[in-house]
Structures are given as C-alpha cells and as structure tokens.
C-alpha cells in the first residue's frame, strides 16, 4: 500500500493542485480533509467531490462549526482577544482546530504525512507545523507551496497541463480566508498601504452608511463569561456569533484595516471583517468592567494580551496558554449579566449594563443625596497613597 498523505483541503486552487502534484511527485495516496468552520460559500459536498475528482483516494468533510465556536471562539471571547489591540484572530483561531482534525484523520486513515498549502511568508505555516509537532511529532509534514516555491501562475499552469477540474483565473486579486468568526483579505492592490479598500473587498459587512437611519439596539446576556442570550432569547455560542454577524454586519460594524506584525518578522496589511466577534468582545469586556475587582481586572488585561499573542504566534497547545486559561476560567465566575449596545454606522456603542454580580454601588458612586461614601476618610488615604512619592521628592529637592 502506498504511503498516505493527509491534506488540509480548502477546495481552492493550491490544495486542488496539491492533490495531483503529491500523487505524481511522491507516489503517495492523498486523503483530503475539508473542515466546515461556518465559512459559507460552496456546499461542502461540492468541495468533497472536487477533491475526489482531483485524485484524492478519500475525501472527508468535518462539520466543526459548533466545536469551533465553543472550544476556540469562546476562549477568545473570555480573553477579549485582540492581537495588537485590533485583530480578533480570525485565521489564527481556526488553525489548531484544523490541525486536530488532520491528526485524527491521519490516525484513522493510516497516514504518515500531513500536508498544508501555506506559503513561507505567512503565519499559518508556523501554526500548522507547531501544532503537528505538539499533537503528533511522529508525523512528517509536506508543504508544497512553500518548499517548491509555487506561484499562482505555476499552479494554474499545472492545473491546465494535468486537466485538474477547477475553474481558475489569473485576475483574482485577493487572498481570502473566512470562517464564522470573521473574514481576512490580503494581497493585490491592498499591499500598497495608501490604497483604500474598494467595495468588492467586503462581503460580511454592508457599507456603514447604508442603514444609517435604522440603528440596531441589541442586548447580549452572559453567564460566567459565556454568551447565552440575545434580546432575552437563548442562544448557543455559534448562534450568537451568526446572529450578530448578520445584525452587526448590516450596520457596517467589524471592518478593520490593519497593518500587523507577522510572526515571521515582516509587516503585512490585512482587511478583516468580524462583526459578531467585535460585538461579543466589546460586550464581554464591558461586563468585566462591571463585575471584576480592580486589581483582578488590571492583571487580566495583561493576560488577555498575552493569550492573544500566543494564539497568533501558533502556540495554541503551549503550557503557558493552558495555564492562562485556568486563570481566565477563575475570573469568569462572576461575569454574568447583560450589556445593551447600539450598532450604527460601523460603530458599537455601549449604553446599558446590568448584573446581579455587579461591583458598582450606586450609593457609593452617587454625588446626590443619599451618598454613603465617607469623604472624611479621603484625606488620610490621599496622604498615605502619595507618601512614597512625597518622600522621594523631598530627598531629590534637598540634593539640589
């Protein structure tokens, strides 16, 4: 029996060409694995059949939408994950899930090699291969696009020469990756930083001015950090993301034009659309402001940033990320309540908060009659709080 290669299959040009190329160049059989992450577009059965038509001996489609939402997007919500304070890890979150299912497929179908279609410039090669090394160090890795310097032109030529059944065009200007958490667009004229995105860049979001006269007010309920309701109606995490993608997307919310620091050392420009993700992270962050004690909240903001950096850098399976998630789980014990937001003109505005776990005390906060704050204690507090600063200032002045 020939050696089997388990290929992460997207249904696009590069991975369709890879099926035929691997067979011709290595003599191996290819098992194509396509993961449904809520990316929409083509029917997954069409994708599966294409893999078979391209020469795969088997083609597997995994419906991982709920798994992706519950086990990958939800931790990102709880960690308010925004790489460089902006990017909600649209692609980065999906890669470890794909790795997991490729490893499972390798065990089930007798594969000794796993393959991906990443280039040598991007972050995804790291995310895939560090993931494989973490979960299945015995598996060999094949990366034909990177290791054999494929270009789009070369891939198209190979497809035409070998009658690979896929429709391609040399004029498609963008590289696109999408799932239910969001959509990433790069390359083409966007590589020139001064060029503004054109309308055809966007798909998940409408023009922010389109529904200008119809703002959308939404109430999101959380239970211990988990989104559980929208406008009082129970939802799963996947349903919350999908519903907010539609509602926030209609208001032009979630458009991000970012120059980010890639793991490989270069800067790249990316256009992201993540309407549901940005609304959920905004709401969750606001509820934490209401329910977390000050020092806990301050420290968690540092761990949120680190968690996002670890995921971006392909270290999903690292001990540090695992440890941080244990900490985050503890912080979510009281993150229960509702946040009201207005979605309008591409913006998210919080205008209401309520929680039985709130640390906001009206009687302490009010400046009106009924104030219970003991202002007589403030003078001594200010003196003690500033004592170290006043002592050092006194010393410095005496030395002049």
Swiss-Prot record:
Reaction(s) this enzyme catalyzes, per UniProt: L-citrulline + L-aspartate + ATP = 2-(N(omega)-L-arginino)succinate + AMP + diphosphate + H(+)
Pathway in which the depicted protein is active: Amino-acid biosynthesis; L-arginine biosynthesis; L-arginine from L-ornithine and carbamoyl phosphate: step 2/3
Sites where the protein binds L-citrulline: 87, 123, 127, 175, 260, 272
Gene Ontology terms: biological process: argininosuccinate metabolic process; L-arginine biosynthetic process; urea cycle
Alphabetical UniProt keywords: Amino-acid biosynthesis, Arginine biosynthesis, ATP-binding, Cytoplasm, Ligase, Nucleotide-binding
Record's subcellular location: Cytoplasm
Main localisation: cytoplasm
Annotated GO CC locations: cytoplasm
Subunit: Homotetramer.
Name this polypeptide is given: Argininosuccinate synthase
Protein source organism: Mycolicibacterium vanbaalenii (strain DSM 7251 / JCM 13017 / BCRC 16820 / KCTC 9966 / NRRL B-24157 / PYR-1) (Mycobacterium vanbaalenii)
Gene for this chain: argG
